[in-house]
């Protein structure tokens, strides 16, 4: 099982989207929350920066990066918790599992550590910074599977974003799409995808160890 991190393991997407909105407004780009979800949730920080620079016709320097990181860090330290039900789901899981996230290793070390989940995945954590193309390209999921010596068709992915779901499908992996976050269920539905809304449902959906892969 390959788990996304933000919005699947740690309940960070609501926080991130809100901070994104504040940061973008500070730069002069006003976006509604649902627009931010569609454009950026599931994508890498590099994609976010490139999109903002192209949209606003400017180069975001180190000062901006430090300010942005400070806003994120403050919000996460105050509000970040594990996704409801994920601890119970992981306790029942009988499959080898890893994390493959658009976030950086430093970010995952912080968020998984803060929520008490780091030890469950240590040594099996993959970041989009390790591959040429982030989600919705399949590179990250294929990299994780290849590193762990598992064929893509024998893998399943737990995702919460439309971009992540697309990446998993493109990798030839079955997707368990969590609709309990910021992305509406209808944007997650599609072939090879099981949509669910409560993490406590996950073990039963995969048969507590035997996902029904296509």
How would you label these PLM feature ranges?
Residues 17, 21, 37, 45-50, ...:
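An amphipathic alpha-helix signature
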Residues 1-38:
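Active-site neighborhood of HAD-like aspartate-dependent phosphohydrolases
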Residues 50-88:
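Metal-dependent phosphoesterase signature
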Residues 74-99, 105-109:
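Short, acidic loop-to-helix structural element flanking the phosphoryl-transfer center
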Residues 26-30, 56-59, 116-120, 149-150:
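Short helix-capping segments at alpha-helix termini
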Residues 23-24, 44-58, 111, 145:
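Helix-loop "lid/cap" segments that line or gate small-molecule binding pockets
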Residues 95, 104-214:
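Asp-based, Mg2+/Mn2+-dependent phosphohydrolase catalytic module
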Residues 40, 44, 67, 81-85, ...:
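Short beta->alpha linker loops
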């Amino acid at each position: 099982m390959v788990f996304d991190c933000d919005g699947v393991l740690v309940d960070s997407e609501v926080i991130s989207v809100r901070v994104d909105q504040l940061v973008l407004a500070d730069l002069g780009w006003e976006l509604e929350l649902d627009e931010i979800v569609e454009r950026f949730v599931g994508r890498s920080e590099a994609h976010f920066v490139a999109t903002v620079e192209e949209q606003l016709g400017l180069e975001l320097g180190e000062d901006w990066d430090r300010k942005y990181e400070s806003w994120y860090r403050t919000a996460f330290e105050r509000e970040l918790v594990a996704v409801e039900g994920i601890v119970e789901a992981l306790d029942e899981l009988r499959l080898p599992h890893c994390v493959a996230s658009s976030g950086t290793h430093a970010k995952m070390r912080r968020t998984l550590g803060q929520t008490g989940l780091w030890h469950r995945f240590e040594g099996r954590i993959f970041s989009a910074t390790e591959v040429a193309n982030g989600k919705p390209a399949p590179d990250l999921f294929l990299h994780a599977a290849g590193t762990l010596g598992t064929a893509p068709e024998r893998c399943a992915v737990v995702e919460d974003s439309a971009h992540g779901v697309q990446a998993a499908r493109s990798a030839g992996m079955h997707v368990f799409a969590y609709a309990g976050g910021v992305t509406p269920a209808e944007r997650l539905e599609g072939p090879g995808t099981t949509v669910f809304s409560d993490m406590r449902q996950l073990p039963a959906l995969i048969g507590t160890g035997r996902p029904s892969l296509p």
